[in-house]
């Protein structure tokens, strides 16, 4: 099985790649959900740091608890199943086996952080209660009688082996029709990508997609409801944010990573489809549903949006001044040359 994943910088069009690949008969698409368990806070990457790179008898156990908490959150609930629905109800089971394999031993006990991790009230109230017990010489009295402390200090080799076994088990369940290729959206980050390849025994290829900041800005201000994810107090702050998220992921020279622009998939479709196929190893004859998911004649409406919105003209000028190296050269392309299926649909989406 060969894994394909996309990474972006928020709203930069990486779904165009997942849409394109879902048109191939040899690809199992997973383009309805993002799987970030490797690089999200308290995910696998953080777990390795605390268990292997910066081991501490108390912090490492806490890291396992935090990872376990993330696993439970990702698995979902009865009314919002999240990961479980995609992993055939086995995500939690496979993850618990992974945690068990990383745990050397465990015992009933706790330390101050276990109190603080509950709430400020718990930290102070239970802390006082614990001191009273100590002064009274209360036998076997504990404010957290069911709390478990995990002890784990694997070698890096053991951690990587366990993690590769873990990710492979998850991917096998996810690829339920045993296709040669499988798309897993946002599996790896756009920064420090290379360090995460070692977590997989399967071959992994990554597309990192970027987009003209002027269009991203207009979409941030007008279309997207996730306004808590980006600054909107001033265009200057927004430009700082745009540059910030890219500077955290300087371009990485690795044969398993392909950088591309969203706009190139629209204006230079045939050229870039060929590049994508070559990069992954796809056979063009397997492209059996062209333009059903990625239709350049439709997706072109998601480009040059800033030219159709006059409300933010002054902001666009400021973006052109502050972020010149990220601008796409729209003057060099012609919409009349765009290929695809004819459509009457217009407007951004």
List each model region and its residues.
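A short acidic/basic microdomain associated with nuclease active sites
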Residues: 182-186
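PAPS-dependent sulfotransferases, especially Golgi type II membrane carbohydrate sulfotransferases
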Residues: 1-4, 89-93, 98-102, 106-119, ...
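Polar/charged alpha-helical tracts
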Residues: 49, 61, 65, 69, ...
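Low-complexity, flexible helical/coil segments
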Residues: 40-45, 63-71, 217-224, 241-250, ...
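A polyampholytic, Gly/Pro-enriched intrinsically disordered region
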Residues: 49-60, 227-237, 305-314
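PAPS-dependent sulfotransferase catalytic domain
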Residues: 2-7, 12, 157-177, 187-195, ...
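PAPS-dependent sulfotransferase catalytic core
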Residues: 1-158, 295
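A generic structural motif
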Residues: 25-27, 180-181, 201-204
């Amino acid at each position: 099985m060969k894994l394909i994943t996309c990474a972006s910088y928020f709203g930069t069009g990486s779904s165009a790649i997942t849409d394109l690949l879902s048109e191939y008969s040899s690809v199992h698409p997973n383009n309805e959900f993002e799987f970030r368990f490797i690089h999200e806070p308290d995910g696998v990457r953080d777990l390795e740091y605390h268990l292997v790179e910066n081991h501490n008898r108390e912090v490492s156990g806490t890291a396992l608890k935090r990872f376990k908490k993330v696993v439970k959150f990702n698995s979902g609930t009865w009314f919002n199943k999240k990961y479980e629905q995609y992993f055939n109800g086995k995500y939690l089971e496979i993850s618990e086996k992974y945690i068990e394999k990383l745990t050397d031993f465990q015992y009933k006990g706790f330390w101050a952080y276990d109190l603080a991790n509950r709430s400020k009230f718990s930290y102070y109230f239970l802390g006082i209660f614990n001191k009273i017990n100590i002064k009274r010489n209360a036998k076997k009295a504990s404010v957290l009688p069911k709390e478990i402390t995990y002890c784990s200090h694997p070698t890096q080799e053991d951690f990587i082996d366990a993690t590769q076994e873990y990710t492979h088990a998850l991917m096998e369940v996810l690829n339920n029709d045993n296709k040669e290729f499988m798309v897993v959206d946002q599996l790896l980050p756009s920064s420090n990508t290379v360090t995460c390849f070692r977590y997989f025994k399967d071959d992994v290829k990554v597309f990192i997609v970027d987009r003209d900041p002027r269009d991203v800005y207009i979409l941030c201000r007008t279309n997207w409801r996730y306004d808590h994810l980006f600054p909107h107090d001033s265009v200057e702050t927004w430009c700082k944010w745009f540059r910030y998220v890219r500077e955290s992921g300087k371009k990485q020279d690795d044969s398993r990573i392909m950088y591309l622009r969203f706009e190139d998939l629209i204006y230079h479709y045939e050229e870039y489809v060929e590049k994508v196929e070559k990069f992954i190893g796809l056979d063009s004859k397997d492209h059996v549903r062209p333009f059903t998911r990625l239709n350049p004649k439709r997706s072109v409406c998601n480009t040059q949006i800033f030219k159709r919105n006059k409300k933010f003209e002054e902001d666009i000028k400021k973006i052109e001044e502050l972020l010149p190296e990220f601008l796409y050269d729209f003057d060099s392309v012609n919409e009349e040359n765009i290929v695809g299926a004819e459509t009457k649909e217009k407007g951004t989406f």
